Amino acid sequence: MNNEHRLEAAPALQDKDESIYQALMTAIVEHQLPPGSKLPEEALAEVFAVSRTGIRKVLQRLAAVQLVTLTPKRGAHVTSPSVEESQAIFRTRALLEVANLPDVIARCQPPHLAALENIIQREQQAHEAHDGPAAIRHSADFHIQLQAISGNPVLTEMVTRLSQRSSLVIAAWGAPWRQGCRCDDHQQLVGLLRDKALQPLSEALMHHFDHIVASLCFERDGVSLPDFSRLFAGHKES
């Protein structure tokens, strides 16, 4: 392969790696790959039609954001957070998100409120359709967009990563997707934000996290090897 062809191939490989990364991350965050699920390089390489080296790079990226755990001689599996880690994740989210509310209130404008209302509507529709992955996605997006109003990209990135790990916690400890965030909680938060009521808003957000943690059942079921061919159908051709 000459230099010109190498230059053309590099972006294509990067795009493929990113596509696989996003597909696996979405499957993990939306509970299609439960905590503890094995992620064999050979099986994933076959499904995505790439080399094991390519899959290994993606798994290392997922491990860097703590969605995948890499164990020597045992390979990769979806991270299964402990009780202590699970509680710490939600405690950290509560501290960060509540502390950021003054900046959220200060910068909030009607278009922000409309965007949050739209997310709640889509979340409610997902619940009514029993679409667990969509409900999880919209619930996380609500919190991320709420915090993004503050204009603090560093904190928003932290909330995004913690929201992904929160999804793992809910999947790991037996609370069905419908027992995570509640639409009526989110609606209450928007109402208090509209009123610029900092103290009630802070208390409501803290209570919201308390409710999520209280809904968890800290007992773990066994896991089996997922059907990767079904789960990622269509990615081989992309």
Language-model-detected regions and their locations in the chain:
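C-terminal regulatory/effector modules of DNA-binding transcriptional regulators
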Residues: 177-238
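Hydrophobic residues in alpha-helical segments
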Residues: 28, 104, 127-128, 150, ...
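Long, hydrophobic, amphipathic alpha-helical segments used as structural scaffolds
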Residues: 104-108, 150-154, 158, 170-177, ...
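Mobile beta-alpha loop/short-helix "lid" or hinge segments that flank ligand
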Residues: 64, 68-69, 162-164, 178-180
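Conserved amphipathic alpha-helical segments that form helical-bundle/coiled-coil interaction surfaces
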Residues: 85, 89, 110-171, 183-191, ...
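Short helix-capping and inter-helix turn/linker motifs at the boundaries of alpha-helical repeat units
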Residues: 15, 113-114, 177-181
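Short linear motifs at protein or domain termini
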Residues: 1-102, 106, 213, 217-238
